[in-house]
């Protein structure tokens, strides 16, 4: 995205603060005009005191300097007051809008599909959020507090100086041209280079986050030195890329400062020559020297502004790219909140593909009545998880219809749909908050008694009560203060607390020991009564009592029936059962006490 368009997008992100932005822009224009009153009045006072008449448009008879001094004081007070008001409101605008856009970004990212998050490192998204909002804050603050006034000063100065003395004004105009050409060349030279620098910053953030997120692996495999060396390599590469960019902008700074001396000398030289010919006055020479000094100052601010926009551009581009990412699913304009559903689920010729080439789900049709338990089995990548993801609209199918209680799920609000579905993931997902906070994800207004009941039914109450802080115990980052079994039992309790009509169990008992698994299965059997339950299973022992089992292979259901019916068919499901030693050749109904070690799970 070109830099001007990118900055226009930055101003567009002002949102509700845009009106205040226009007010500040008008105030900056008045401030710019008032600032140039000082050198004009100063020059007039010099002419009055020296007895010389100004020339050209400023030619007037000599007069008392006191009215000029009074006008100078009035303009000075106005400049101070207006500048303070602009700075105060610019600060407030920038701070308020930074928090607003940060919240909008966070909400937007949470709505992006799981496929987006799978392909994007969470550390990178955090870095983009924090760096992007900080960059916006700096640009908004600088633009409305200083840089816009500097731009307006240039707009005011050039016509004003031409009006006073066009010959001396040509020197100021030449200075502006030199600055514009120089800055444009440097920006073009270094724009792509700065983009590579920012990409390295993202790599640095992602690598550090990756190492910290796997600290147990790093320490147990003695990888500390290797990870530090890897980070140092990325940092060194970043520094090597950044140095040429800094060198170019340092050159601009040097030339800017050198131009101050050159311009002032040129004005004095040309001014003296014009004065000898009677084409200018001493006051006008002094006035234009002040103009030149102010012009250099304003140009430095403008160059600083361009430099800051340039340096922030890659960060802003990343930020805008995330904001422009489109969620896979959205509420339709006519979407309705269905309230509490009964749990009648229908898949009618549903097909879906992630890449548009290989189908992940193809012509899937089945009906689950309220209270039934539907198990989905098959090899990894067969389409089980995709089918369930379509049910709660992580994606929408390319063809076919999914209905709940006879209503197309695409006609329901996402919040209304997902409020009716409880999920227990294979990997227990917990926040770095208290146990109570994690449980209330399922029901925000849950009482402690309700949490105790849910925890008890999930076999989690015992370990919660053993803790000194009980439900106020912090679970740690991603629940790391708890064991795997404890985390999973809390996630089950959370789903029970939600009390949804539709329940999804993604190998929900895989992290539990045999004794606890048996207890939790008994609790789940009781809880699943009256609910439509979908069980994604790899261990076939967990789905023996399912109402129906759907056997997936390459996105299709190749077998369907009860546990015993599928065994009797001696098909693919029976092969899976044999592989897990769930049945014996002589008696298919006999179940082993435990799965032997070394037998792979499917």
From Swiss-Prot:
Disulfide bonds: none annotated. Belongs to the ABC transporter superfamily. Beta-(1-->2)glucan exporter (TC 3.A.1.108.1) family. SUPFAM superfamilies: ABC transporter transmembrane region, P-loop containing nucleoside triphosphate hydrolases. It is an enzyme of class 7 (translocase). PROSITE patterns: ABC_TM1F, ABC_TRANSPORTER_1, ABC_TRANSPORTER_2, NDVA. It comes from the Bacteria. Residues 345-579 form the ABC transporter domain. It catalyses: [(1->2)-beta-D-glucosyl](n)(in) + ATP + H2O = [(1->2)-beta-D-glucosyl](n)(out) + ADP + phosphate + H(+). In NdvA the ATP-binding domain (NBD) and the transmembrane domain (TMD) are fused. Pfam families: ABC_membrane (PF00664), ABC_tran (PF00005). This is Beta-(1-->2)glucan export ATP-binding/permease protein NdvA. Keywords: ATP-binding, Cell inner membrane, Cell membrane, Membrane, Nucleotide-binding, Sugar transport, Translocase, Transmembrane, Transmembrane helix, Transport. NCBIfam families: PRK13657.1 (NF010178). Residues 21-311 form the ABC transmembrane type-1 domain. PANTHER family: ATP-BINDING CASSETTE SUB-FAMILY B MEMBER 10, MITOCHONDRIAL (PTHR43394:SF1), ATP-DEPENDENT PERMEASE MDL1, MITOCHONDRIAL (PTHR43394). It is found in: Cell inner membrane. Involved in Beta-(1-->2)glucan export. Transmembrane domains (TMD) form a pore in the inner membrane and the ATP-binding domain (NBD) is responsible for energy generation. InterPro entries: AAA+_ATPase (IPR003593), ABC1_TM_dom (IPR011527), ABC1_TM_sf (IPR036640), ABC_transporter-like_ATP-bd (IPR003439), ABC_transporter-like_CS (IPR017871), P-loop_NTPase (IPR027417), Type_1_exporter (IPR039421). GO terms for molecular function: ABC-type beta-glucan transporter activity; ABC-type oligopeptide transporter activity; ATP binding; ATP hydrolysis activity. It is a multi-pass membrane protein.
